[in-house]
């Protein structure tokens, strides 16, 4: 009976080599693919359309500053958590270039604090005394477009209500309502990167 061991061994080596080549050409599923960017959409009259299906909650979370009323004489301009998300495709470009590309959407979802039990507006929960997130309360959105918003340094500012539900569309805010403060005080390109460590490079 002829010996087949060398032939079988050779076949196994060839199969293993082919499998290795195929594996090398296939990206593992856990590696992130290049993201298709979610770009801003506008109505025919130029209003910004609220991103669909609350998709911003799946975007890159960059920070949540808090300015409660109780610490601002009851008159805080934004008496909520500012839960800020950045569109992922734009974030990938920012990581590589250090610049916010045209089409960048920064979505600030406002969230009230739970009612306070103390003069400073804080309350006590199992984790300790502090401020705790409550109901959502509308949203502010900024969009980068150096041509469309040339008059305000390349960014457009929008409000989708300071209550729920969020408005389906929003009109561009005048320079004196939002842009002037960002231009004067934000650390990088009208973005408060000094409060968003993920972006503070």
Where would I find each of the regions flagged by the language model?
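Bacterial N-terminal signal peptides
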Residues: 9-19
């Amino acid at each position: 009976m002829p010996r087949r061991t060398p032939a079988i061994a050779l076949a196994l080596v060839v199969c293993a080599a082919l499998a290795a080549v195929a594996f090398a050409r296939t990206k593992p599923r856990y590696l992130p693919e290049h993201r298709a960017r979610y770009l801003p959409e506008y109505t025919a009259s130029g209003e910004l359309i609220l991103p669909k299906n609350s998709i911003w909650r799946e975007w890159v979370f960059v920070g949540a500053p808090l300015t409660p009323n109780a610490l601002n004489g009851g008159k805080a301009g934004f008496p909520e958590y500012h839960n800020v998300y950045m569109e992922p495709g734009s974030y990938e470009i920012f990581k590589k270039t250090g610049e916010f590309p045209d089409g960048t959407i920064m979505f600030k979802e406002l969230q009230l604090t739970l009612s306070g039990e103390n003069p400073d507006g804080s309350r006590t929960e199992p984790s300790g005394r502090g401020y705790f997130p409550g109901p959502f309360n509308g949203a502010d959105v900024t969009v980068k477009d150096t041509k469309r918003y040339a008059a305000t340094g390349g960014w457009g500012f929008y409000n989708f209500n300071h209550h729920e539900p969020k408005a389906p569309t929003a009109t561009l805010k005048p320079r004196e309502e939002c842009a002037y403060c960002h231009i004067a005080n934000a650390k990088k390109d009208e973005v408060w990167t000094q409060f968003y460590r993920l972006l503070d490079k």
